Amino acid sequence: MKAFTQHTGLVCPLDRANVDTDQIIPKQFLKSIKRTGFGPNLFDEWRYLDVGQPNQDCSQRPLNKDFVLNFPRYQGASVLLARENFGCGSSREHAPWALEEYGFRAIIAPSFADIFYNNSFKNGLLPIVLKEEEVDELFQQAEATEGYQLTVDLAAQTVTRPDGKQYGFEVDAFRKHCLLNGLDDIGLTLQDAEAIKAFEVRHQQSQPWLFGAIK
């Protein structure tokens, strides 16, 4: 998993509340057994004018020019600004996969659905909860200023505006450690690989009957 320490990026303001995971990545794309390839289908039903299908060449599809992610000024955005209850709905992990693959590193909102919030940390995506009035301020600035960027510092737990004003945010210490060091569940387990191997050796020596061939 890619570590997150500090990131400065273009902000895309998605001014919609209660964005659910089916809107983030529609159900027809969940058939894939891989965790890659979802970026082109992020917000598929909003980004395109046709109905998307798995393995479709999205470069040939008609774009919805009224959707914010398609505005030329927000191309290359890596910080998503959202409204309350972002990521609600089903627990599909494909939602943070699609956001991360598109290029988003952080999402700022007044609140997140719990499962989406947890899944984001496990996939290198930083969900940041700010006060509603702070999010309102950021929406006003991002919509008024082309090329608007924010700097997110996970170690310091701050979001910094271009004018220098900072907002602090809370994050669980364990999640912070994992994201700073790029550790997902597998990475955490592999840190104890030698201890696991040693246990397996001791276990096989102390209870060899468990490892005998079945006749």
Curated annotation (Swiss-Prot):
Keyword hit for Coiled coil: no
Pathway: Amino-acid biosynthesis; L-leucine biosynthesis; L-leucine from 3-methyl-2-oxobutanoate: step 2/4
EC number, UniProt record: 4.2.1.33
Keywords: Amino-acid biosynthesis, Branched-chain amino acid biosynthesis, Leucine biosynthesis, Lyase
Cross-referenced Pfam families: Aconitase_C (PF00694)
GO MF term (any one): 3-isopropylmalate dehydratase activity
Domain of life of the source: Bacteria
GO biological process, one term: L-leucine biosynthetic process
Group of enzyme by EC: lyase
Catalytic reaction(s) noted: (2R,3S)-3-isopropylmalate = (2S)-2-isopropylmalate
PANTHER family in the cross-refs: 3-ISOPROPYLMALATE DEHYDRATASE SMALL SUBUNIT (PTHR43345:SF5), 3-ISOPROPYLMALATE DEHYDRATASE SMALL SUBUNIT 2-RELATED-RELATED (PTHR43345)
Function: Catalyzes the isomerization between 2-isopropylmalate and 3-isopropylmalate, via the formation of 2-isopropylmaleate.
Complex and partners: Heterodimer of LeuC and LeuD.
Database matches in HAMAP family: LeuD_type1 (MF_01031)
UniProt-recorded name of the protein: 3-isopropylmalate dehydratase small subunit
Species assigned in the record: Stutzerimonas stutzeri (strain A1501)
Gene: leuD
